[in-house]
A protein has these predicted regions:
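Long, contiguous interaction/recruitment modules in multidomain scaffold/adaptor proteins
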Residues: 1-10, 127-128
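Short coil/turn linker motifs that delimit alpha-helical repeat modules in TPR/alpha-solenoid proteins
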Residues: 11-12, 31, 45-48, 74, ...
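Amphipathic alpha-helical repeat scaffolds of TPR domains
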Residues: 13-24, 50-67, 99-121
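Alpha-helical segment of the N-proximal tetratricopeptide repeat
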Residues: 14-41, 45
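Charged, low-complexity interaction regions
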Residues: 32, 68-73, 94-99, 124-127
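Secondary-structure boundary/capping motif
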Residues: 34, 38, 45-49, 56, ...
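Alpha-helical repeat scaffolds
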Residues: 37-42, 69-92, 129
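Short solvent-exposed coil/turn linkers within tandem alpha-helical repeat scaffolds
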Residues: 44-51, 89-102
């Protein structure tokens, strides 16, 4: 039983990383529609994950920059919660992460910070701090 649970955990982690890589690819291709699809999968399968929070923040900011009226107010309100989740994950140790996952987390952290700073410089404040 323990071996089966271990296998499921490894499979789940790889599936989550694959989604994170998919989001990064769609972000780099600037494809908002496909980014939304990946974000929806995160919300359905890994709602509390670091990558889900980061992907959602990045997607909402990009959508807001494209057209502020496309972003419902409740999504904007949730940004500060997601940002706190990201900050919490960033305080956790990264010793157990492999090189690929560490690089992916660094990319996500960098993109979240860049996008949040850009929007805050334009007068929209996400953080509740």
């Amino acid at each position: 039983m323990s071996l089966l649970q271990n296998f499921k955990g490894i499979f789940k982690k790889h599936d989550e990383l694959d989604l994170a890589k998919d989001f990064k690819s769609e972000y780099e291709a600037k494809n908002l529609e496909n980014m939304k699809s990946v974000v929806d999968k995160f919300v359905d399968h890994y709602p509390d994950s670091y990558y889900a929070s980061c992907s959602m923040v990045i997607y909402i900011i990009l959508l807001y920059k494209e057209d502020p009226f496309k972003v419902p107010p409740n999504r904007l309100n949730n940004l500060s919660i997601m940002e706190r989740n990201i900050k919490f994950f960033d305080t956790l140790g990264t010793d157990s992460l492999d090189k690929e996952e560490l690089e992916l987390r660094q990319w996500y952290r960098s993109e979240v910070q860049k996008n949040v700073k850009l929007m805050e410089s334009e007068g929209l404040r996400f953080s509740s701090d």
